Amino acid sequence: HKDVMARILDCMWVPLLEVKPGEYELIELNTKGKHVYTHLDNDRLREGLHDALGRYHASGNVSEEDTRLAREVLRSYGSLRAETDVMRCKIYSLLLSAYKLLGDEEEFTRLHDTMRGMLPVVKAPQSRALLLVTLYGCTDSALYRQMAHEVVDPWRCESSPKKSKQTLIRRLDDYDRWLRHDEQ
């Protein structure tokens, strides 16, 4: 659970309500001083897009429901501007999947090129893994697959990896299975 807080008179924080992950969406970032919103956390959209990509890889088609979900992601995050690489990786991951499902080749190619250009400078391992796993799942590139496994596979040996690492491990395994690379 998280508390949504309000700052009163620059001296006191008061809880407004309590929310669970996935029950809220990032609306805007605080650009003055410390970032109030430090992560993008909407499990319904992230998991929904991932499942939609699975259905797309299985059938080659996109359902009406999956199209609606992809459009919702574009409405919610398409014009959001992030100031940190971590936030950019999260937003771009959502958007690339949405463009793939919608068949928007122009925007997909533009964002793919942007993400590829970010790879050398993104140092945070989980952000780098998110980029690579997303790129692999949306392009079926052997290079992105190899790079994603290089980052993610060592996490499999951790005694209790964080939830975000477990999610990336599962997604990578799903893409290997959906793209028929799990036999290798």
Each model region followed by its residue ranges:
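Terminal, low-structured helical/coil segments at or just beyond the last alpha-helical repeat
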Residues: 157-184
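"A position-specific structural signal for the A-helix of alpha-solenoid helical repeats
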Residues: 7, 11, 47-54, 94, ...
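TPR/TPR-like (Sel1-like) alpha-helical repeat modules
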Residues: 145-158
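Structural signature of alpha-solenoid helical repeat junctions
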Residues: 4, 87, 107, 127, ...
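Helix-turn-helix repeat elements of alpha-solenoid scaffolds
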Residues: 20-30, 59-75, 105-113, 144-147
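Flexible helix-coil transition and linker loops at the boundaries of alpha-helical arrays
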Residues: 33-42, 75-86, 118-123, 157-162
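Residues that mark the junctions of alpha-helical repeat units in TPR/alpha-solenoid scaffolds
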Residues: 41-48, 66, 81, 88, ...
